[in-house]
């Protein structure tokens, strides 16, 4: 069966003029002027008209499907995939990445956006108000400046509770150097992203942080005698003192807009992680933190940029640095004549130590090591004891409670080494 195609206005005009030329009612020169073609091309059109008739004036691609056009079955498959429950909150850019990675369907962003829009499927971002971020130039070297922050969000489908994602991002390359999720913004989260950064990338020159009391003191506390003798001019936070030990310059950001790099990262991860967690059936923080270790590599491979300077400002972590003792909350305590001390109304005895009464010790607290005592560069274990008879009591919940209070809760407040 012969397929007929309708001519558009230009093709109809061209056919009419060439017919006049063939019939002798118009010269080649007149046809050339009227159509804006060369006389040589008009002669070719005359020859084609004589041989094939008016249909030869149709464009050569008429009725031909473009090579890039997707077949109906593939379009339907894309729609079926998009309508799956785990993709109900995915934006267009992320969905394009998922199609390529998971289903081996490669389409352009513009096609996918228009195709979904025609089928009344809009990106979740379409309904949001656009935030204006004043961009500044990136630092020239990786490791020259890192931005640190935490963001609360409902990351798990069907769970209305908010969980806080802690993160570090390199300003020059846009690479994530650490991600860790906790219930609230806390020292534990910041300890873990620092551990990831120091191990996998090295020690950066500086870190850009907001004015949180985790990073900076918010009141003019009186200096301890030790601090005055050492020449310290103002109090420092637990996190700040760790940065000083590492030689990292901690810079205070004036506003959230000043940390634009990490604010944009949060916008991206709020969208993507919800979908990624649904796809991978992740429903709690422990599973999420395991997943995030590999997700950092995936994200960096896709989104990192090449810094202006190939030389890195990161320096290797000294082998002598023990991260398990460095990334801890530290408190000064004085022991009694039984090698005991108290912390948060709980008494502890230091195990296997020969120490004089009234000696000052460092108490180290973290999720990684629990509660330990550092004395003469050596770590000692401790046990909770009864105040009445100085006998050890098996109450691991006491230790867990103190760790939780100092690492997950108290460290949201202004905590100094005391």
Role assignments for model-derived ranges:
Residues 232, 238-308, 314-325:
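Charged alpha-helix within mobile-element recombinases
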Residues 201-231, 312:
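Acidic/histidine-rich, metal-coordinating catalytic segments
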């Amino acid at each position: 069966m012969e397929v007929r195609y309708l001519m558009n206005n230009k093709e109809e005009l061209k056919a009419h003029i060439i017919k006049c030329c063939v019939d002798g009612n118009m010269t080649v020169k007149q046809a050339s002027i009227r159509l804006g073609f060369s006389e040589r091309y008009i002669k070719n059109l005359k020859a084609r008209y004589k041989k094939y008739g008016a249909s030869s004036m149709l464009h050569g691609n008429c009725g031909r499907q473009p090579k890039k056009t997707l077949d109906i079955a593939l379009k339907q498959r894309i729609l079926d995939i998009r309508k799956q429950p785990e993709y109900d909150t995915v934006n267009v850019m992320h969905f394009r990445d998922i199609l390529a990675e998971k289903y081996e369907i490669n389409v352009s962003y513009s096609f996918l956006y228009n195709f979904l829009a025609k089928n009344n499927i809009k990106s979740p971002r379409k309904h949001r108000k656009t935030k204006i971020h004043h961009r500044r130039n990136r630092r020239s070297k990786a490791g020259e400046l890192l931005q640190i922050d935490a963001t609360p969000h409902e990351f798990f489908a069907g769970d209305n509770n908010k969980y806080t994602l802690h993160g570090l991002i390199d300003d020059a390359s846009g690479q994530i150097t650490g991600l860790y999720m906790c219930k609230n913004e806390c020292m534990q989260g910041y300890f873990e992203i620092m551990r990831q950064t120091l191990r996998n990338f090295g020690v950066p020159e500086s870190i850009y942080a907001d004015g949180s009391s985790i990073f900076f003191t918010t009141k003019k506390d009186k200096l301890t005698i030790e601090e005055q003798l050492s020449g310290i001019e103002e109090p420092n936070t637990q996190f700040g003192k760790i940065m000083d030990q590492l030689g990292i310059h901690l810079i205070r950001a004036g506003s959230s807009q000043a940390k634009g790099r990490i604010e944009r990262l949060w916008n991206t991860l709020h969208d993507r992680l919800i979908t990624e967690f649904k796809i991978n059936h992740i429903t709690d923080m422990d599973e999420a933190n395991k997943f995030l270790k590999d997700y950092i590599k995936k994200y960096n491979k896709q989104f990192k940029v090449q810094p202006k300077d190939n030389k890195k400002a990161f320096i290797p972590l000294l082998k002598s640095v023990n991260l398990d003792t460095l990334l801890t909350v530290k408190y000064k305590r004085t022991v009694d004549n039984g090698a005991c001390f108290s912390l948060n109304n709980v008494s502890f005895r230091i195990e296997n130590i020969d120490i004089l009464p009234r000696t000052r010790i460092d108490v180290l607290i973290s999720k990684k090591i629990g509660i330990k005592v550092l004395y003469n560069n050596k770590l000692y274990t401790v046990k909770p004891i009864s105040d009445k008879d100085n006998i050890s009591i098996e109450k691991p919940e006491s230790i867990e409670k103190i760790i939780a209070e100092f690492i997950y809760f108290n460290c949201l407040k202004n905590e100094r080494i005391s």
